[in-house]
Amino acid sequence: MAQSRLFFSADKAEAERTYNILEQAFEDDGFPIAITEIDEDRQIFEVSVYVEDDAEEVAARVDALVGPGLFDTEELPDIDWVTHSLEGLKPVRAGHFFVHGSHDRDKIEPGDIAIEIDAGLAFGTGHHGTTAGCLELIEETVQTEHPTNALDLGTGSAVLAIAIARLAPIPILATDIDPIAVTVAAENAAKNGVAEHIVTATAEGFGHPIFRSYSPFDLIVANILANPLIELAPSIKEHLAPGGSIILSGILDSQHDAVLAAYQTQGLTHQKTLHREGWVAIHLK
């Protein structure tokens, strides 16, 4: 199958801005999108989009989003670029969490809460600003509020569910609409030694009967996108235990106020917002 890479290099701020635009635009297409540092001295980063067969069509969409002629295109050998696209990313620290691939186990330091997530078919490796913000809020919330159960809605790679389990041995339900993500989530939970605490399920919204067995939740985390978060606000509030906390992300800076208003309308109180690389993570109670 023909594979191509669309790529563009710029300074850190411009590369991150472009990466965020493309990731938001191509969320439903499933194209792997990566940002990697290619010149540490000059702080130059490269944004790559990996596509199969339809490179010209995707290139036209990219031009419409970020301006014509910025991205170059190259043909690639037939290898697993879904995995390869993120191999160059460095480990990420978020609070005491250290999210890393298997090739960076030697970089774990004393005191780290290590989470091993290799790049693959499920979104959410911890290398993304929106995930990092969630991890920081999870650490603070779990350690201060001591929830007795939790929900990771739209779990992706299960990095957030794993983070909760590493802090507290409580029942955690991790759901996603994508069955591939659910399979990957279960594998990652096992790899990180917390499978006994995490139950995974393929579910869209809250329609799955499994929620009747676990709800209400002391802690709900949802790192998805702004529009689904707004639509799900009543259901998320309905499944939150009295006094419980919600941590939301997948939200651009410009979308913060609209998402916050949707949850304040449900009677929730804003606790804190973290800003990371153009994205926000919101804590409400």
Swiss-Prot record:
Identify the Pfam families for this entry. Answer: PrmA (PF06325)
According to the lineage, what is the superkingdom? Bacteria
One term of GO molecular function? protein-lysine N-methyltransferase activity
What EC number is given for this enzyme?
2.1.1.-
Print the keywords alphabetically: Cytoplasm, Methyltransferase, S-adenosyl-L-methionine, Transferase
Keyword S-adenosyl-L-methionine assigned: yes
Q: Give the GO cellular component terms, alphabetically.
A: cytoplasm
What residues does S-adenosyl-L-methionine bind to?
T131, G154, D176, N223
What is the annotated localization of this protein?
Cytoplasm
Give the catalytic activity: L-lysyl-[protein] + 3 S-adenosyl-L-methionine = N(6),N(6),N(6)-trimethyl-L-lysyl-[protein] + 3 S-adenosyl-L-homocysteine + 3 H(+)
> Quick one: a GO biological-process term for this protein?
methylation
S-adenosyl-L-methionine recorded as keyword: yes
Task: Please classify the protein's predominant subcellular localization into one broad category.
Answer: cytoplasm
CDD domains from the entry?
AdoMet_MTases
This chain's function reads:
Methylates ribosomal protein L11.
- Per the similarity annotation, which family is this? Belongs to the methyltransferase superfamily. PrmA family.
HAMAP family in UniProt: Methyltr_PrmA (MF_00735)
Q: What is the name listed in the Swiss-Prot or TrEMBL entry for this protein? A: Ribosomal protein L11 methyltransferase
**Which organism does this record belong to?**
Brucella suis (strain ATCC 23445 / NCTC 10510)
